[in-house]
Amino acid sequence: MAETFEFQAEISQLLSLIINTVYSNKEIFLRELVSNASDALDKIRYESLSDPSKLDTGKDLRIDIIPDKENKTLTIQDTGIGMTKADLVNNLGTIARSGTKQFMEALTAGADISMIGQFGVGFYSAYLVADRVTVVSKNNDDEQYIWESSAGGTFNISPDNGPSIGRGTKIILHLKDEQTDYLNESKIKEVIKKHSEFISYPIYLHVQKETEVEVPDEEAETVEEGDDKKPKIEEVEDDEEDKEKKPKTKKVKEVKTEEEELNKQKPIWTRNPQDITQEEYAAFYKSLSNDWEDHLAVKHFSVEGQLEFKAILFVPKRAPFDLFETKKTKNNIKLYVRRVFITDDATDLIPEWLSFVKGVVDSEDLPLNLSRETLQQNKIMKVIRKNIVKKALELFTEIAEDKEQFDKFYTAFSKNIKLGIHEDSQNRNTLAKLLRFNSTKSGDEQTSLSDYVTRMPEHQKNMYYITGESIKAVSKSPFLDSLKEKGFEVLFLVDPIDEYAMTQLKEFEGKKLVDITKDFELEETEEEKKQREAEEKEYDGLAKALKNVLGDKVEKVVVSHKLVGAPCAIRTGQFGWSANMERIMKAQALRDTSMSSYMSSKKTFEISPKSPIIKELKQKVEADGENDKTVKSIVQLLFETSLLVSGFTIEEPAGFAERIHKLVALGLNLDEEPEAAADAPAADAGVAAAETSDNAMEEVD
């Protein structure tokens, strides 16, 4: 008895999109179904390594493609792991994968439908060419079942009492009238060669061949039998010849079904790299990754000696949509042992920061019966991992030699490089050479750290950088002024991960990396030193007064020679968070608040003795004292504007807004009390405004 199930809502939407699509490259359905068949074969082969009896239901691991022109069906059959009834219900309809929604969003945004495999929903591409799909599946742990749907919102599942398929899955596509081209032998061969030539299992196409065979000619025999009844003329000489008379035959055409292997090519990684064309690498990359674009770069190498393995590593042109999804298992490197697929889930084979690299590794030394647990402990795996990282870095360095290629690479994977600097202490310095940043001297282009070093003036000891939310924000920062005056270049770090990377890197080619939003010592001449000491002495009283007014809001107030145009700014201590890091940490939903209070910045309020505002404020404090209302108001306003310009947020934005509004009112000669101003005669308005202007700043608190 067939059971009817409803498709999950998102899958129904996806099917509707696929059925009504106008995409011309519908051939990708075959790539997806063959790829799924290969995955199913991988699974049963892996299980059989620990339990050989799993293959008792069929040792021949293969994929068959069977076109039937008479019934307009195309069948793709594998001898893989097969699906239980529960698998059929869940995998083909009721449970949406994480990629379903993302794929629909990508489709509606104009992405190509050939991306479907990357989102884990490749099976549904069958509906590009079929109006009805039947799936027959047999798993070792369950009976044989049939799944069937015309994608109308529901699907049926029933026990299959027909011929047993042993183990595996048979997908029967009932083709649309306009898609019967996919029943032609030449078309199927073309699509398989293009997309699936490097699948690890043999793909057999069932082709009908017409041959001529000789069969007994029964009609001729009948005629001869009739001749026997006629009177015989005796011939003595030919007695022996008559005895040896052969039966008569005729030639007839017979149609036989033959199996033709479509992917006889041996594994590409076992071949000499010099014999492999770029087209072959591109075809292999696409079959490996489900990408519809060619790769950006490839590294094909073998390691020999105490340890032997071959590998091919590919760098894609784009970052995948789920590159930094922590819960998703990364299966970009397929591990083989002596050409036998073991797993694509060997997390220890490649570090997380390299998770965008795709490829295969084929080891001669690992045991075939490896479990995922023993993989993690295996010493050979550690050596393979070290070599993969080394070769990947060589590949990135090669890409860097071509600016156009490297720009594409860096746009897509700069975050991975920075994550590598943060996590991989051994390769930190090599990775640092790949970093690119905008700077005060680079214009619209980005500069490398090596190029920065070549431009450093002789008297510059350190390399300087500033962190912030955007290039627009940091390029106007008051912290840049004194360094620009000295001709020192400053790097702009505006990616949230930049600061994490720099705190681990610390130095480059012997030069210390310095964050100019934190306390640091700026190179100075003897004359500059004398001037600074004199100004510190002169403004020491003002600094103490401002500290008293601001209290615990700042750790200290200092006279600064690092500010030029701005009257004041707020710098943080060497060991706490910078303003930028504080902003990033506050945005973390699951942040540790106790850690935040411990690490939050110790603020230093810097005042510039060169600023007319500070000079005037000094006189005001000396004349009226630090407790004067106007002094307190001015100091508070200067502090809050410094917070903003230095990259911090204001804790009480309403109070800040009120002070700004009072200042605006003062500039416009407006009365503080609008109702009173409205009641006053027009002639008195000017007098009221004039009186207000003298008192307004005193009331700004």
Curated annotation (Swiss-Prot):
The keyword ATP-binding applies. A motif (TPR repeat-binding) lies at residues 697-701. Its main location: cytoplasm. ATP binds at residues 36, 78, 123, 372. Residues 677-691 have a biased composition (Low complexity). Residues 212-257, 676-701 are annotated as: Disordered. Keywords: ATP-binding, Chaperone, Cytoplasm, Nucleotide-binding. SUPFAM superfamilies: ATPase domain of HSP90 chaperone/DNA topoisomerase II/histidine kinase, HSP90 C-terminal domain, Ribosomal protein S5 domain 2-like. PROSITE patterns: HSP90. GO terms for molecular function: ATP binding; ATP hydrolysis activity; ATP-dependent protein folding chaperone; unfolded protein binding. CDD domains: HATPase_Hsp90-like. Belongs to the heat shock protein 90 family. Molecular chaperone that promotes the maturation, structural maintenance and proper regulation of specific target proteins involved for instance in cell cycle control and signal transduction. Undergoes a functional cycle that is linked to its ATPase activity. This cycle probably induces conformational changes in the client proteins, thereby causing their activation. Interacts dynamically with various co-chaperones that modulate its substrate recognition, ATPase cycle and chaperone function. Homodimer. The TPR repeat-binding motif mediates interaction with TPR repeat-containing proteins. This is Heat shock protein 90 homolog.
